[in-house]
């Protein structure tokens, strides 16, 4: 008995293949998107819950640190299972973008965020922001003794009087801004003086706790740590004050948290929709009401009323697309900080 191979006509074969392709596409969409997330988990969970409720698109989060996930994406390349990358700071976004791993974002999405909070090339976008701040214990340091600039912390009189977390992505982002603003030579000199003057702690929250307990007079961290603690019990921040350098000082640097869609994503439409949602009115409104206490960056969006308004911080103009994490690590290593 012979097999009948041509029982389906050309039209039927075409229809069959189209149905199979559509089914595979639908199955792929049903799986939702995978986000490599280095942002605060509670904030991103609020975003994910709102997005899924509105769109029905499922989201799987893989949480980690800026540098950890950024380097992982570079290593995985086009084979990465990630559809979206979210960070706390810009340098990790620059790392991934330099590896040519991001897809261009939709024009409508880019238009939702103020131009100063997104790179002009349009391959990633600001999703939130945080300000550098000098925290101090008024029992140890009077207002008259406060430094005029972040650069003053390199002076001999600050030896043993301030703290930071040099191994963290947050502080390294601050150094990356210093590098862009002042250049390699000045940055290395400041880092070497820092090595002599400061006390190292692991994590910004640990720096805050140490200042609060009077173990060290002051520290350089991001603004939201005391606000987050104050919204809970305040036990780790009740004894500290916040000082904003302003005057476009390197210490007034505002770091942009970034979001981007991987070019290798098999769920481009859904991934683009997620970035559009979190930078839109609903996503940015969550920043106003959520206890993450980060700044909203959307056009016309309001931040938490407890925060000093972004426009009043007088931050330096820094091109987030130029922040160089690799060079920062090299310089900090040379200075003996890593």
From Swiss-Prot:
Keyword annotations from UniProtKB, A to Z: Ion transport, Iron, Iron transport, Metal-binding, Periplasm, Signal, Transport
GO MF assignments: metal ion binding
Chief location category: periplasm
Taxonomy, superkingdom: Bacteria
Coiled-coil region(s): none
Binding, Fe cation: 40, 88, 224-225
Example GO BP: iron ion transport
Entry's family note: Belongs to the bacterial solute-binding protein 1 family.
Classification via Gene3D superfamilies: Periplasmic binding protein-like II
SUBUNIT field: The complex is composed of two ATP-binding proteins (FbpC), two transmembrane proteins (FbpB) and a solute-binding protein (FbpA).
Xref: InterPro entries: Ferric-bd, SBP_1_CS
Subcellular location: Periplasm
Function: Part of the ABC transporter complex FbpABC (TC 3.A.1.10.1) involved in Fe(3+) ions import. This protein specifically binds Fe(3+) and is involved in its transmembrane transport.
GO cellular component: outer membrane-bounded periplasmic space
Protein name: Fe(3+)-binding periplasmic protein
Cysteine disulfide links: none
Signal sequence, renumbered to the chain: 1-26
Gene symbol of the encoding locus: fbpA
